[in-house]
């Protein structure tokens, strides 16, 4: 409910939290809506960072990214996402198609930093290599599972964790890691 969401957001913000992670699919869009209402009611758009995600399975294709971002922005009542991550990967789609779509959306001013959530290291690094080669916008953010407990089996289909090789890459390439973990 809105009351429950506002209470959680107020407690998080009051404890110093300034980064809010949301996604197009969370609670059928109500996650975005409640967060947007809270941001607007507290006039905090310039005080916080919003991480948004879209293109979750089965709509994990480039043509779904922009419309889902626009719908999320409307729900959130903000003009742009500070950070945007593709929510899942679709290995049947060339990384170039994702990077090209995200570069266009960034050039429109709808997102600042781009990244990926639940992408394997080979695809993530391939996407960055393509972006640098073609002078496109590279992934600068990763939001994979990472915690003190190693994920043996994915919590949900398509989830990817950060292993030692991935961590070496993240550190070497100076990727911002916004991990998630089941609770």
Where on the chain are the PLM-derived regions?
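Conserved, mostly hydrophobic/aromatic
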Residues: 5, 20, 35, 50, ...
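Active-site mouth loops of central-metabolism enzymes
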Residues: 1-3, 53-64, 87-93, 156
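Short, acidic/polar
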Residues: 1-12, 60-76, 97-100, 124-129
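Acidic (Asp/Glu)-rich catalytic clusters
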Residues: 14, 36-49, 70-77, 102-106, ...
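N-terminal binding-site loop/beta-alpha segment at the start of enzyme catalytic domains
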Residues: 1-48, 107
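A short, structured active-site edge motif that brings together acidic residues
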Residues: 46-57, 84, 141-146
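Beta/alpha (TIM)-barrel catalytic core signal, keyed to glycine-rich beta->alpha loops juxtaposed to Asp/Glu
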Residues: 89, 93-183
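Short catalytic-loop micro-motif centered on adjacent basic/acidic residues
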Residues: 19-26, 85-86, 112-117
